[in-house]
Amino acid sequence: MKFSTVAATIASTFAVASAASESVTYVDITVTPEVTTSMVSTVKVTSTPYTTTTLSFAVQSNSVSHNETTSNSTQTTTVSLFEGAGNTAQVGAGALVAAVAAALLL
């Protein structure tokens, strides 16, 4: 048998196999589900949208103290007055307390 005859025989065999495979009928059996279930849940979280501030003032003989406490930190401010000013020191301390309070409220 010559090489050309073998090649022709192999080619005709593949032609028959491919012709036979083209006559196969395919059936689609994909099924779509009728009901679907979602597994998503929601959690609601709330928090307080503000902070609490506590102000306190203390007037001593020679100084004025201011304490400010919030939910996050505490701040203390002390202002010393000059000694020997007499009644002027007390009036100045009252004015200082009022000025600090007004500044914090604005």
Swiss-Prot record:
<keyword id="KW-0449">Lipoprotein</keyword>
<feature type="propeptide" description="Removed in mature form">
    <location>
        <begin position="85"/>
        <end position="106"/>
    </location>
</feature>
<keyword id="KW-0336">GPI-anchor</keyword>
<protein>
    <recommendedName>
        <fullName>Protein TOS6</fullName>
    </recommendedName>
</protein>
<feature type="glycosylation site" description="N-linked (GlcNAc...) asparagine">
    <location>
        <position position="67"/>
    </location>
</feature>
<feature type="signal peptide">
    <location>
        <begin position="1"/>
        <end position="19"/>
    </location>
</feature>
<dbReference type="GO" id="GO:0098552">
    <property type="term" value="C:side of membrane"/>
</dbReference>
<keyword id="KW-0732">Signal</keyword>
<dbReference type="GO" id="GO:0005576">
    <property type="term" value="C:extracellular region"/>
</dbReference>
<feature type="lipid moiety-binding region" description="GPI-anchor amidated glycine">
    <location>
        <position position="84"/>
    </location>
</feature>
<keyword id="KW-0964">Secreted</keyword>
<keyword id="KW-0134">Cell wall</keyword>
<comment type="similarity">
    <text>Belongs to the TOS6 family.</text>
</comment>
<keyword id="KW-0472">Membrane</keyword>
<keyword id="KW-0325">Glycoprotein</keyword>
<feature type="glycosylation site" description="N-linked (GlcNAc...) asparagine">
    <location>
        <position position="72"/>
    </location>
</feature>
